[in-house]
Every structure is written in C-alpha cells, then in structure tokens.
From Swiss-Prot:
Organism field: Vibrio parahaemolyticus serotype O3:K6 (strain RIMD 2210633)
Cofactor note: Binds 2 manganese ions.
InterPro entries cross-referenced by the UniProt entry: Alkaline_phosphatase_core_sf (IPR017850), DeoB (IPR010045), Metalloenzyme (IPR006124), Phosphopentomutase_DeoB_cap_sf (IPR024052)
Name of the protein described by the UniProt record: Phosphopentomutase
Origin: domain of life: Bacteria
GO CC annotation: cytosol
One record GO biological process: metabolic compound salvage
Gene expressing this chain: deoB
Compartments (UniProt record): Cytoplasm
Required cofactor(s): Mn(2+)
Residues reported in the UniProt entry to bind Mn(2+) 1: 10, 346-347
C-alpha cells in the first residue's frame, strides 16, 4: 500500500539561496537565526527557555541539511544525532518567494512567469479596480489601500471599519490582495462574497491570491484574526502530481489546513479544516489512520509563517518548532512498510530579518520511510524534485520538472 504524507512547515527556511541577492535576502536563515537567538537567551518565553532543542527533527536530518545549506551547524541542534532518514536542501526555481509558487513547485509545477504585484506602499490599488469591486459589492468605500502588516492594520483601521462598514483592503510584497473584515459587524459570508468578487476582478492583474482575513474583538488592541481565513488562488498552470495521482491512479489527496485553497482545489479529493498547530497535527494523525492505498495526506502548518515569521516572533517560532518536534514521532509510529513521510517548507520567513516579508531560502527536504535509505540527498536544484519523486513513487506519468531522489 503506497501512501505519502507531506507536512509543510510554512516559512521554515534553512539558509539563503544563491539568488537571494535578487530579493534582498542575502544572509537570511530562518532556522539558523532562531537557533542563534535561543542560544543567546533572547528567545525565552512562557513556553520555552534556552537553546533550541529539536532532537527528533535532528534524527531525521534537519541539522545536517542546514549545515549543507549554510556551512554551519545551528547551535543547540544535535550534530551527532543518529540519522534515520534521508535529508537535503532544495533551491527554488520559481520566480517568487510566495506560498503558491512554493507549493506548486513542491507538486512539480514551478512558477516560471512573473506574478503581478501592487508595488506602491500607499495608494496601492488602481482606482478603476477598487471602483469595480465596490460597485459590484454594493459598498460606498473602503479603508487601507496600502502595504500593511496584517495585525497592525487591524489596530490602525479596525475600529473605523466597524463604525463605517467599509472593508480594509491591503497588500504586501507578495502577489496578494487582502481583505480584512469583522466577522460580527460585517459578516463572514459577506466577506467571502466580497473576496470572490475581487478574485474575478483581479483576473487581468495576474495576482496570485485574494485572502479573506476575518477578525473579531471589541476594539484596538483586542482584535484577533480568526481561523476562517480563506485563500482564493488561481489554478496551477499545468497538472500537479496531486492531479495526476487522482486522475491517472484514481487516488486520493487529503488537504489539511489551507492546502486546498493554495491549489485552487485542483487535485484535492477531501478537505479537512483545522486551525492552529495542535489541531492541524491531530487532524493529520486522524487522516493518516484513515488513509488507504494511493493516498497523499498533505498538511500546511501555516502558523509558523503567519503567527511567528511575519510577526518576527523568534520565541514563538522556536516554541512552535519544539512543539512540532515533540510530536513528530507520533506520525512515524503510524507509518506502514511502504509509506513515505516528507517534511519540507515553501519559502523562508526569517523572524530576525528586517521588515515582515518572506525570505528567499533553501527549504529542508527530510524524507522518512522504512524503505528509504538514510543519508544525504544533497542540494536539490528545485522544489519540484519532491513532485517528481512522488510521481515515480505512485507510478504516474512523469512531471516536466524535477528529479527523483529515491
């Protein structure tokens, strides 16, 4: 019975890529810099203290993959761990450092075109675009129209939004159009309808995602984003390995978290919603227990990125990594003789880096299975090696990009 479990630690980069200079990210290193801060005692909180401890991920090859990427061992990690899996680091072929590009490339379809972006920090959106959205939605105005941190924009504009009923439109360095609205005063269904209108109106702008950002709370300093986020993505430009598994092998792909949104539901046969790393982990375990032959269970752990990377919360990121490390053996215990586990990421988001944006980094490629030889996979030229490996494993037609590493 062939089953693959893909766990994406969203934003968990392990060192800058050779082309990082094109993105202003030379020297970025999500894992390494978190470990450095922990070693210095600068990442203590109520959930963790001291050096970064990831013994189980180190056994799967994380410390070695990071060393091959950067030339140094991350402090605190066990450099002498007995390696039980295959490990490597992969560079990104895609032109961006965003979530869809990273995930699509993981599934064998790199993004070789340039996304559209809203580059102006203020007055970010064309008036003709916002006018059409407002007219179709029956709204008299909107707030924002700028680059913004998703949490800061709530403090800045959340109360005005509640008073006026005008949605908050904002963007970032990514190819995104984000809409924040209060779940109770504006309404979740109304927000999702508004996002669908925006998705349709953005077709000519080549924007990767429209993101619904619902929040709750009575006022400034008390606003909190909810788990009802939705990502409305465009479809991948060609068939991913997920689609090939479903169409060619009548297989199944179980999306946990925002995976289905990222792939615009293409190649997804089941969607499981969960919010927060513990709930996402529990859902993953349940779906692994239920998974049959020719199945991919695919989970995105978004909080590493959204709650800690973008917010530049080193201590929070470190605590989340240690929590994840403490539970990963629960997955290993459920694995059958032919199963394959792949731990990876979609980009970096170094919480010590200036600004709040993603960073162009190598991603870890940690592979475990009873039939997977332990040892180095080296540097992979593209994330698409993961997709090509899955295509070979499941016996689908090959992908156009990537090399099988098993």
């Amino acid at each position: 019975m062939k089953r693959a479990f893909i766990l994406v630690l969203d934003s968990f980069g392990i060192g800058a890529t050779a082309d990082a200079k094109e993105f202003g990210d030379v020297g970025s290193d999500t894992l390494g810099h978190i470990a450095d801060q922990c070693e210095k005692g600068l990442a203590d909180n109520d959930k963790r203290q001291g050096a970064l401890r990831l013994p189980n991920l180190s056994k799967l090859g994380l410390a070695m993959a990071h060393k091959e990427s950067t030339g140094r061992f991350a402090p605190g990690l066990d450099a002498d761990a007995e390696i039980i899996g295959a490990y490597g680091h992969a560079a990104e072929l895609s032109s961006g450092k965003d979530t869809p590009s990273g995930h699509w490339e993981i599934a064998g379809v790199p993004v070789l075109f340039d996304w559209g972006y809203f580059t102006d920090k203020a007055n970010s959106f064309p008036k003709e675009l916002t006018d059409r959205i407002l007219e179709r939605a029956g709204l008299d105005g909107f707030l924002g129209n700028c680059h913004a941190s998703g949490t800061q924009v709530l403090d800045d504009l959340g109360e005005e939004h509640m008073k006026t009923g005008q949605p908050i439109f904002y963007t970032s360095a990514d190819s995104v159009f984000q809409i924040a609205c209060h779940e109770e005063t504006f309404g979740l269904d109304r927000l999702l309808e508004l996002c669908q209108i925006a998705r349709e109106e953005l077709e000519d702008y080549n924007i990767g995602r429209v993101i619904a950002r619902p929040f709750i709370g009575p006022g400034k300093g008390q606003f909190e984003r909810t788990g009802n986020r939705r990502d409305l993505s465009v479809e991948p430009p060609s068939a991913t390995v997920l689609q090939k598994l479903v169409e060619e092998k009548q297989g199944n792909v179980v999306s946990i978290g925002k995976i289905a949104d990222i792939y615009a539901n293409c190649g997804i046969t089941k969607k499981v919603k969960a919010t927060g790393i513990p709930a996402l982990f529990e859902a993953t375990l349940e779906q692994i227990k239920e998974a049959g032959d020719n199945t991919i269970v695919f989970t995105n752990f978004v909080d590493f990125d959204s709650a800690y990377g973008h917010r530049r919360d080193v201590a929070g990121y470190a605590a989340a990594l240690e929590y994840f490390d403490g539970r990963i053996n629960e997955v290993l215990e459920l694995m059958g003789e032919d199963d394959v586990l792949i731990l990876t990421a979609d980009h970096g988001c170094d919480p010590t880096w200036p600004g709040t944006d993603h960073t162009r980094e190598h991603i870890p490629v940690l592979v475990y299975g009873q039939k997977v030889p332990a040892g180095s996979l080296g540097r992979r030229e593209t994330f698409a090696d993961i997709g090509q490996t899955l295509a070979s494993y499941f016996g689908t037609s090959p992908m156009d990009y990537g090399k099988n590493f098993l």
